Amino acid sequence: MNNEQFMTLALKEASTSQNDLPIGAVLVCDNRVIAAASNQKERTSNPLNHAEKIVIEEGLKKIGDFRGKNIKLYVTLEPCPMCAAAIILSRINEVYFGAYDLLYGAFGSKINMSRIMNSKIKIQGGILENECSKILTNYFKQLREEEYGKPERTS
C-alpha cells in the first residue's frame, strides 16, 4: 500500500469518531496495519485519548517493544505537542499527516517538536490534505448548526 491508501484508512477511522473531533490514525509496521483508532476523548471522558496515542499504545504492545522499529504513523491532522512527544519517545520512524494544524501543530505548523527533542524522524504533511481538512470543516459546521441553527437564506 502507498501513503494515500494508508491515509484513506486513517480517514475511515476519523469517520467513526461519533461525537469526538474526527481525527483518525493508523500505525503501520512492515507495510501492515498494526493498530487503527479515532479520537476517543469525549467517549471516554479522557482528554488524553487522542487517536495517535491510542494507536501507539496498541501497536507497540502488539509488537512487544516500546521502541518502534520500521514503524510509520498516518494521522489525519498534524499531531499536537503531547502526541508529537509520544511519537518521538516511541521512536516511530516516519509520520505522515493530512491537514496542517495552525493552532496546535507540533511538527512544523506552530512548533517543531522533532527539532526541540533532537529527533531524526521523517515527517511529511499534506497527504490527502483536502479530504482530511473537509472532515474537520464539516464537523465544526455541524457543531455550529446544532448550537445556533442553520443559517437562514436570504433572497
Where do the model's predicted regions map?
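Short secondary-structure boundary/capping segments
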Residues: 25, 63-65, 113-115
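Conserved Nudix-box catalytic region and its N-terminal flanking loop in Nudix hydrolases
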Residues: 43-46
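Helix-adjacent hinge/juxtasegments
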Residues: 48-49, 53-88
